């Protein structure tokens, strides 16, 4: 099970991200692509976690090498979902993916999304919000 203190930090971060997006004028009713970030020291370790996330219903990006402090390299990927900008839904995904990261000994590096212009194109069928979505992928 994920560390309760780290989960609480993520919950606080989630609310801060949502608050800042809404203060900046992002569309509160849009469907957002949520990018959860995972990293590991080697491809094989990350691949196991990515495959599990895919089986849970998430979309997974191609792994990339990323140079970090002091020239070290990690392998990273994003675990993607689409949902409303709802803290409880995102909290459920964060907890699920933090547990997965712990299981496979990879790092959960938080999540991000993009500003959604409320004056953007209308009529996009992808903006359907599923009222029954509890955030957890099965």
UniProtKB/Swiss-Prot annotation:
The keyword Transcription does not apply. This is Regulator of ribonuclease activity B. Globally modulates RNA abundance by binding to RNase E (Rne) and regulating its endonucleolytic activity. Can modulate Rne action in a substrate-dependent manner by altering the composition of the degradosome. The gene is rraB. GO terms for cellular component: cytoplasm. It comes from Salmonella typhimurium (strain LT2 / SGSC1412 / ATCC 700720). InterPro entries: RraB, RraB-like_sf, RraB_dom. Keywords: Cytoplasm. GO terms for molecular function: endoribonuclease inhibitor activity; enzyme binding. It is found in: Cytoplasm. Belongs to the RraB family. The lineage of its organism: Bacteria, Pseudomonadati, Pseudomonadota, Gammaproteobacteria, Enterobacterales. Residues 111-138 are annotated as: Disordered. Residues 118-138 have a biased composition (Acidic residues). Interacts with the C-terminal region of Rne. It holds the Pfam family RraB. Its main location: cytoplasm.
